[in-house]
Amino acid sequence: MNPVLQRLQSFSAAEEFLDFFGVEYEPSVVHVNRLHILKRFNQYLNRSPVPDDMDEVTAMATCKALLKQAHDDFVKSTAAQEKVFKVFQDQDGKSISLDSLKASLATRGQRA
């Protein structure tokens, strides 16, 4: 494993990653989307792996760019739109009208 990636294993907060790479970030975006940002960063790392033999300067620059991209995804969009986690991927096309919900609740109330 690349030494830069090894150092990341000790981090637990999104802010630690962002500070380590010197990525400027919006605290309000990170507060709401921290897990989404880290998951997206991991997805980007999987698509553009950092080889074990990549020099530290290049590895740092690569990771910084990928983390900045992950953060910026959630500046411009929402977690539901980005669909990083499965719970958001399963929501497409599933909506329930308010009238349908009211009718369902009324039917349940009659059975009780």
Swiss-Prot record:
SS bonds (residue pairs): none
Keywords in alphabetical order: Nitrogen fixation
InterPro entries reported in the protein's UniProt record: NifW (IPR004893)
Signal peptide positions on this chain: none
Superkingdom as given in the UniProt entry: Bacteria
Cited Pfam families: NifW
UniProt-listed GO biological process terms: nitrogen fixation
Keyword Flavoprotein among UniProt keywords: no
Keyword NAD applies: no
Family according to the record: Belongs to the NifW family.
Complex formation: Homotrimer; associates with NifD.
Task performed by this protein: May protect the nitrogenase Fe-Mo protein from oxidative damage.
Name of protein: Nitrogenase-stabilizing/protective protein NifW
